[in-house]
A protein has these predicted regions:
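N-terminal pre-catalytic "stem/leader" segment of glycosyltransferase-like enzymes
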Residues: 1-40, 275-280, 285-287
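Active-site proximal beta-strand in glycosyltransferases
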Residues: 32-62, 76-78
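Aromatic "clamp/platform" in nucleotide-sugar-dependent glycosyltransferases that forms part
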Residues: 180
Length: 287
């Protein structure tokens, strides 16, 4: 839903005209590109004749629907990030393109330093095998923060509403982001938009979704921060790197060495990403 809402907001800001779920118009105008942003069930809503731009809120892997291009008149599939494109490319070749949705930089803004009362927001998005990772990853991070005298609070993916996250970001000076991998990573990008630098666990390795790995799909490398540069913060791959990574990261936070919001403004605004989406739409019209 966030992808759909932010795409619409971006299209509104650049003055683009569009229709929402107007299936009757699509049926009457079969030459017009149908942009199906949502999940695959929408593809079965009717017998499409329109050329379809599908994504970026798609299914997890092409093996879920290997005959998709034969079943429906899909011309291009959008995925949120580069590593996902590489995973899909052997199946659908050049029909796969990268498109990330934009971040609302007017809503996710930097708070005044005087509001910052907590050093670290520990963002827990561990999706699988959490019982194993709790004692060997999460608890050691807590211990490092305690030993370094840093105050912290925790937030867990799926257990908050956006406004709670936004409030937490306004009160925290930095964030530690824990996730096996991200296709885009809207939440950490919202933090970057708030000018909150991030120390991210980015261990690479295989795509770990247990519905696919290792019995159906073995793909590597993946990333937990697919949109990133040195302005955003720092990364560590394993817990034994944290002893050096944390103090270096914190020192740079204190000295103002990071500028994460600049990265978002340069790459992932609502307007920039909506314009990129229109480019994909027009590429089908011109084909």
């Amino acid at each position: 839903m966030r992808v759909f809402l932010n795409l619409r907001a971006g299209l509104d800001r650049i003055g683009a005209c569009y229709r929402v779920n107007d299936y009757g118009y699509a049926v009457k105008n079969p030459a017009v590109t149908a942009c199906i942003v949502g999940k695959p069930h929408v593809l079965d809503r009717l017998e499409w004749k329109n050329p379809i731009l599908f994504g970026a809120a798609v299914f997890s892997h092409p093996i879920d629907d290997p005959e998709l291009f034969q079943r429906r008149p899909i011309r291009k599939v959008l995925v949120p990030g580069a590593w996902m494109k590489e995973m899909w490319k052997p199946f659908w070749n050049d029909s796969v393109a990268v498109w990330p949705v934009g971040i609302d930089t007017a809503r996710w803004v930097a708070a005044e330093p005087a509001r910052k009362s907590t050093d670290v927001l520990l963002y827990d998005k561990i999706m699988w095998d959490r019982d194993r990772l709790e004692p060997i990853l999460i608890e050691p991070i807590r211990q490092v923060l305690r030993e370094s005298g840093r105050s912290f609070r925790e937030i867990r993916y799926g257990q908050y509403v956006e406004e709670q996250f936004r409030l937490a970001l306004s009160e925290c000076r930095s964030m530690i982001f824990l996730c096996e991998h991200e296709t885009q990573g809207i939440a950490y990008q919202q933090a970057l938009s708030c000018n909150v630098p991030i120390l991210a666990w980015d261990h690479g390795g295989y795509w770990q979704d247990p519905s696919y790995f290792p019995h159906k799909v073995k793909f590597q490398p993946v990333s937990s921060v697919p949109y990133w540069d040195q302005r955003c913060g720092r990364t560590f791959a394993a817990i034994d790197e944290l002893e050096n990574a944390w103090p270096a990261f914190w020192d740079e936070c204190r000295s103002g060495g990071f500028s994460p919001r600049d990265y978002i403004l340069e790459n992932l605004t609502l307007e920039k990403c909506a314009s990129a989406y229109l480019h994909h739409v027009r590429s089908l019209s011109d084909a």
